[in-house]
From Swiss-Prot:
The family this protein is said to belong to: Belongs to the UPF0178 family.
Pfam families in the record: DUF188
InterPro entries referenced in this protein's UniProt entry, alphabetically: UPF0178
Record CDD domains: PIN_YqxD-like
Listed name of the protein: UPF0178 protein YaiI
Length: 151
């Protein structure tokens, strides 16, 4: 089991939660990004730097993740691909993607892309609230407990 992070877009506060969780759970945490990242010294935490470019980090995560892994991403198409491989996917707000919800999210993502392409300003997500951070940490712990039961 490995936790993969789509790190270019992951908020620092979520990375901090993940650093602590990797130590506590003694699980590999791999942050994939197209830029250099500073991470705390740990035998469980490492970075994987990829070339800059559209979906390069996403493609590397899909290539390397396995069934039973967890991928942290707000990227809906990436979440869909890792779910197909049997990995779990969790966004930085603590929403766990599932086979049941991912199709709806992909449809909404496509719709928003169409709106943006036609010139409509759609805005971005709200900033992470303390409640979002708590929800993320709780869902991370829930995934960990479920993974331990499956062993």
């Amino acid at each position: 089991m490995t936790i993969w992070v789509d790190a270019d877009a992951c908020p620092n506060v979520i990375k901090e939660i993940l650093y602590r969780a990797a130590e506590r759970m003694q699980l590999p945490l791999i942050l994939v990004a197209n830029q250099a990242l500073r991470v705390p010294p740990s035998r469980f935490i490492r970075t994987l730097r990829v070339a800059a470019g559209f979906d390069v980090a996403d493609n590397e995560i899909v290539r390397q993740c396995e069934a039973g892994d967890l991928v942290i991403t707000a990227d809906i198409p990436l979440a869909a691909e890792v779910l197909e491989k049997g990995a779990a996917a969790l966004n930085p707000r603590g929403e766990r993607y599932s086979d049941a919800t991912i199709r709806e999210r992909l449809t909404m993502c496509d719709f928003m892309d169409t709106l943006r392409a036609s010139g409509v300003q759609t805005g971005g997500p709200n900033t992470l609230s303390p409640r979002d951070r708590q929800h993320f940490a709780a869902e991370l712990d829930k995934w960990w407990l479920e993974s331990q039961r499956k062993k």
